[in-house]
From Swiss-Prot:
<dbReference type="Pfam" id="PF19032">
    <property type="entry name" value="Intu_longin_2"/>
</dbReference>
<dbReference type="GO" id="GO:0008589">
    <property type="term" value="P:regulation of smoothened signaling pathway"/>
</dbReference>
<feature type="region of interest" description="Disordered">
    <location>
        <begin position="750"/>
        <end position="769"/>
    </location>
</feature>
<dbReference type="GO" id="GO:0016192">
    <property type="term" value="P:vesicle-mediated transport"/>
</dbReference>
<dbReference type="GO" id="GO:0005856">
    <property type="term" value="C:cytoskeleton"/>
</dbReference>
<feature type="region of interest" description="Disordered">
    <location>
        <begin position="706"/>
        <end position="745"/>
    </location>
</feature>
<dbReference type="GO" id="GO:0060271">
    <property type="term" value="P:cilium assembly"/>
</dbReference>
<dbReference type="GO" id="GO:0060173">
    <property type="term" value="P:limb development"/>
</dbReference>
<keyword id="KW-0206">Cytoskeleton</keyword>
<keyword id="KW-0217">Developmental protein</keyword>
<keyword id="KW-0963">Cytoplasm</keyword>
<keyword id="KW-0970">Cilium biogenesis/degradation</keyword>
<dbReference type="InterPro" id="IPR036034">
    <property type="entry name" value="PDZ_sf"/>
</dbReference>
<dbReference type="InterPro" id="IPR041489">
    <property type="entry name" value="PDZ_6"/>
</dbReference>
<dbReference type="Pfam" id="PF19031">
    <property type="entry name" value="Intu_longin_1"/>
</dbReference>
<dbReference type="Pfam" id="PF17820">
    <property type="entry name" value="PDZ_6"/>
</dbReference>
<dbReference type="Pfam" id="PF19033">
    <property type="entry name" value="Intu_longin_3"/>
</dbReference>
Amino acid sequence: MDYTRGVSVEAAEEEEERRGWDSHSAGTCSSSYTDCSSCCSSDLEPEWLDRVQKNGELFYLELSEGEEEILLPLSPLEPVGVNHVRFNDSEAEILSEERKNVGKNSEPRFRKLAKMLKKKHTSKKGSAGLNGPTCPTSILKQHSSQKAGIIVRYQYRDTCLYVNPDRLPEGEPKEKSNLLQALIGIVHQSSRNSKRIERQGSQEASQRLSNQEKLVVHGFIPGSPAIRCGQILIGDTLVAVNDVEVHVENIERVLSCIPGPTQVKLTFETPVLCSGTALQNQSTQVQTSINDLAALVWGDEHANSQQDLQRMSHIVMYLTLRLDSDTSKEEQEIIYQYPVSEASHKLKSIRGLFLTLSDMLQNVTGAPIISSSLILNDELVHVSYWKENDKLLLISVPAQRFPLLQLKNMTADIVRTLKFMYSTLDRAFCQAENISRLDHFFSLFFQRALRVFSLTGIAGYGSQFYDACSSLLVENLPGVRWLSLPEDIKMEIDTVLSDLEALDFAELSEDFYEMRRLYMIIGTCLFYKGYLLSNHLPKEDLVDVAIYCRQYCLLTLASERIGQLIIWREVYPQYHLKQCGSSATEECTEPGGRYFLLIVGLRHFMLCTLLEAGGCTSKATGHPGPDYIYVDQVKATLLQLEMLDMSIEDRLSSAPNPCLSCADWFLPSTRDKLGNFTNSAVLSKLQTPPKKAPSPVSKRRLFAEAASSLRTRRPSPTRSSGGSDSGTDGAGESVGVVTHSTPDMARKFGRRESLGSGGSDGSGGSGSLLKINKKKYSLPNPFSSGSLRKNLSERETDDIYNTIKLTSGPENTLFHYLYFETLQGVFISPTHKEVEQLGGSIHPQLIKNFHRCCLSIHSVFQQALNQKNSKQSDSVACMDVAGFGPIKEHGVLFECSPENWNDQKKSPPTMSYWVVGRLFMQPQPQELYVCFHDSVTEISVELAFKLSFGMPL
């Protein structure tokens, strides 16, 4: 791996080390971005400034003070610092950097002042800039000063060599650097100053100079490991051996501690000179960064997923169909391949089969190939195809872990993300500088997908299981989870975001500098713990940003309490680029417009901002990095929204509405236990009809309030995997599929208010009632202002107790639901906490089957939409498609029983439930999925679907 850090040359290095704080503060408060002559002590540079790459991109992550202590010990995220060694008579004792610094008077003073200056990137071990990992701390301390003029940029590189101490010649005198030459093969010549001091006989001065003298490579021993590896250059400086800091004085003793034949890691330092105004080198290997990010998000599961990936046969190839017949170069059709491993070698060797299928089937059928399946080494493998012009993108994964429907959606998301990041697939795969970035992208992608599969196979129940089960569906939907909020909170958020988008601040206004602004904000979207709170972006831009955040686990990361997250990169939103190429909008778009994505996260909030350069703003040239004024304004916006933290948490922790039931409550034994509770006086009071029948006008008004309140469900933070091709995952389960269409007038389903009992919240027969004053409370439409929701404590004091539920009758039979609004690009479903409150032993299996079936039903709906939008089919042909109409409905019937049934005398109780999905075609396609008990009547099913009434249908 390569580490980069920009520092300046300054004399008197010895004095710098003794002065401690003075030298460190000088290096902290300055950077190679600006000349020190113009640097002002009162104008500190941002802590992320030295993380910006040459192409202007930035990925900077800093943990919060609490999370770094919890997460870092659980994962290999923290870069391994260079250790120090203290020799005794019999052994060498390794001292960590923290232990070595104990007792230094300058360290506490430095840390205290560093926190005051907010320069935590040099003192906090939890700071991790993901585009440039920090160097070992002891190495950084050697170069902490700054001076105007020449800038020295030190690049750190790790090289692994195999050494064998047993092959050393016996009886050879132990001269200085003998082991360095004999074992490693590096020749180092001492400086003239050290030789002069040795001749003068000053032992103390000689030892002090030896401790400071660097091990510069001056030559090599022929045939040695150093010359065979070809990665060590003359002029490099050896700074560490197996993460132990070395210098002239201790190198021989460190090498003598090598017990036998082994692989040794050598860390080299290479100086690079550049001008004082040059930007920092971007160049760090991001593989460590991506691994660090994955370890931060998933903890110990990260190591397990890496081991599984090494054994799993999977491959990503980008092939060209246009071959040069004049050259006989092997593998000339392969433009990109990941991974390069033995497991993927077999898939790589049959790439000719994939090319033939892609070309032949398109010539025969006239349509491009989408997917294929084959048996390879007694294992079923799915292959997904994506063809553009004369290039073909192939993704192959084992069918046991990735259902085919999931693979198709994953491929579409990958293509959309790469186009959002690089404009075209050719630009992404054909440019050499993007190869390492693509490796990291696909590494994180497969780790994330494999983790979902492993979590769904673990027996148990919890937020991780629900997150994994639901991600199979929600990660394949072109949308993001929505969280409905009370009117006052939503209006306050929208007002703050509108003020930011107006850019009417002093430094951002055109009148301040009498020049054009650098950027214009197209829109923003605000997330909290992965939930979308507010969106001011066009729908296509929102989906692009959401998929990008999903691919890099940013939504999951925001669920943790992060200290600071800053991401900046140029993006290519297809929605705006298509408008630029359209003749209808050509006069409205300035040529040369460029788009940039700025993501800033603080604690649980994450604000994504899409900016445009060009047009009415200044034209961007080169690769501009993030402007600190814009970053500071976004930070200030998030700090302003922090006061809403408690209100949003209360919203997430509130009781489910509409009420959900646990599947275990409907088992025969459980239903008997709940019989007395069902017939209680409280529920009888709830079922009592109103004394005075309302007028038709009041009926419509009353239903509008109830329906809109029922509609606005909180979005679920769920993400999961599985496969909905089969619905028989649990023990003793059988599935039956029922497909039917609904006529046009079925769209006008019964719009009646449903008030009654049931919906007890909890498990094992214990429940709590939602107490809602219907006259004072109704939930708002997620996309418009509505009535203000009251707190649970206030509702408990109301005189009238009503339980809002979607099904009629004495019992609430609704288990789960999901509503996908394609027009807005959002979906709504129960939250993690709402599902966790239900518990149960059968209910987790129900949740898993629900999302597996919804994925299959969603695929059927997409086929219907593709047929409708196909140019070859007109409206008459669309109506002839089986089951196609203004509303399309598919359902799956499950029968389940407890998996661990110990009573051999009695057969396990069974319970049947439906998973039904509906597609509304007009005015915009919308999808609604519900799961309910088999005992519900047809009218109750219609009432369940009024969950979508609050949305525009």
